[in-house]
Every structure is written in C-alpha cells, then in structure tokens.
C-alpha cells in the first residue's frame, strides 16, 4: 500500500486531527487507557522574509508542536506535549525548553463535575526524533518518575499532586531505530514511521508492506494512503518540503551569523583588553614621569 510519510509535519497534523487515531496513538505510547483527548496543533507561522507573496510564505507548518489534554481511565487530567524534531539542532532544543517552561506557567481549561475549571495540569512530553541518540539502543524509551525513599532507598507506591505538577514523564521515539517488527501494538504503530521503502527520492511517499492487524491500524493506513495518492495533497506535501528546505537554509544563515558575531565579540573583547593594558601602561609611564618630576623638584629645592 502506498502511504505518505507520517514524519512529515503536515501528515502528522492530519493524523492527529482524527480523534480515534489521536487516542490510539497516545494510548499506545503512554500505555494507559484514555477516556478523552482534546488535541490542538500549536502552529508557528513561517514567512519568507525575501518574498511574502510566495507559496512558502503562506505555509504555517514550520514548527508543529502538539498539545493534548487527556483524561485517563482513573479520571485524572494531564497535558501531553508532542514534539517532532527531525534533526539534531541546538536552537530547537533551547526553543523547546523555553516552550516547555511556558506550559509549566499556564493553567489549562478542563471540564469537571463542577463545570469548567482552570488548573495547572501534570505534563507528559513525547519526542519524535528523526535522529539517533548515542547509547540509547531502542526505538521507544520511557523516562519515568519514581518516588524513592532516600532513607532506605525503597520505591514508594504513592502520588503527590504537587510533585506530579513539578516533574514530568517523557516518551522518546527514535525513528531511525524503528525496525520491521510487529509483535506488539507499539511496534505495529511505529511501523508506519519506519524510514524505508520510499518510492522516490523526496522521502514523502513510501510503500507500507506489512499486514494490518486491527481496524485502527487500517484507519491509519487509509488516511496515509489518501494523503500519499491524492494529487492535491501530494503537491501540498511537496510545498512543505520546499518550505522546510528554505527554513533550514535560513536557520543555517542565522547560526552562521551568530557564530560570526561571537567571533567578532571575542575580537572586540581582546582589543578592549589590549587597549586597557596599553592605557594602564601609559598611565603607569605618565605616573612614573610625574614622580620623577616631583623628585627632581624636591632635589632642586633641597639643594637651594
């Protein structure tokens, strides 16, 4: 079956707009039953500073971070942040740290028996990485929080509302480490993200060669097939790829400019230090000269 590559921001956005798929995706990764999912993509508009009338200027997909508020089977509300990061980039890491900090400061609207309320929710982060982490040899990793008694080092089977809101669990998917295994529900879901069997060099369209084990897997495959075969959607995906190329080029220019500015600042700092040293030497020479003049005047007066 021909499908669109779900690592594409637009494709992932399309999938997550389907409530059944979003719930299946989150339940599978988080390994818990979810009663409700309210997911909203956080779009960061992209504008080409050279030509605002261009097609890429109208494309609002350059960074698609997804925020979901969920209600678990035990009635607990949580906030899930989903980040697609295709390349290892320091700017992206710092951007998401700031983005995470902003969400820690926010209160979220939830529906309760008492009506709508605004509360600070526990946060869960999901990172879909397009690169490998060194020494982390697994396609899917859970970084969990534990309550450990530091006196006797025993794990405590408890929960504190305050602690839950000050710490968070993380789920990391390393897309390049996904292999052709379908033994578990998680492996079946991740098989759509496997970066093999592309039909051309663009990396946008691929063949999905595996059996579809259940209705939700078939639903995902059908949505990806539609995106991968509809001519208008294919053109939209190609546009996104071009916009991403422009974005990366401009990002490279920004990083280069930052590096050049750092070098220039270091040179200025060195020049200032050298000038300071020169001024100090001149001040010392001047003071020495003044001291000699003063001594000469004293000697002259003494001789008279």
Roles of regions detected by a PLM:
Residues 1-169:
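Accessory alpha/beta interaction modules
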């Amino acid at each position: 079956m021909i499908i669109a590559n779900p690592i594409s921001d637009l494709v992932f956005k399309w999938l997550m707009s389907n409530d059944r798929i979003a719930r299946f995706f989150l339940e599978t990764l988080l390994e818990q039953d979810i009663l409700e999912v309210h997911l909203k993509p956080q779009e960061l508009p992209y504008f080409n500073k050279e030509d605002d009338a261009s097609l890429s200027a109208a494309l609002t997909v350059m960074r698609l971070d997804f925020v979901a508020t969920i209600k678990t089977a035990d009635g607990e509300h949580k906030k899930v942040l989903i980040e697609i990061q295709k390349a290892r980039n320091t700017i992206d890491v710092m951007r998401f740290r700031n983005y995470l900090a902003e969400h820690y400061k926010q209160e979220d609207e939830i529906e309760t028996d008492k009506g709508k309320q605004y509360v600070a929710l526990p946060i869960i982060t999901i990172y879909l990485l397009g690169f490998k982490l060194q020494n982390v040899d697994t396609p899917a990793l859970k970084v969990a929080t534990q309550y450990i008694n530091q006196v006797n080092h025993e794990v405590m089977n408890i929960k504190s509302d305050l602690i839950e809101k000050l710490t968070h669990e993380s789920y990391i998917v390393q897309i390049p480490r996904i292999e052709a295994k379908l033994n578990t529900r998680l492996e079946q879901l991740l098989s759509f993200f496997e970066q093999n069997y592309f039909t051309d060099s663009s990396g946008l369209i691929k063949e999905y060669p595996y059996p579809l084990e259940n209705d939700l897997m078939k639903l995902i495959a059908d949505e990806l097939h539609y995106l991968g075969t509809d001519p208008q959607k294919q053109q939209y995906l190609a546009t996104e790829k071009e916009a991403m190329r422009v974005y990366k080029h401009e990002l490279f220019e920004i990083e280069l400019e930052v590096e050049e500015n750092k070098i220039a600042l270091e040179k200025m700092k060195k020049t200032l230090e050298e000038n300071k040293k020169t001024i100090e030497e001149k001040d010392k020479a001047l003071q020495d000269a003044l001291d000699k003049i003063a001594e000469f005047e004293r000697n002259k007066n003494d001789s008279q």
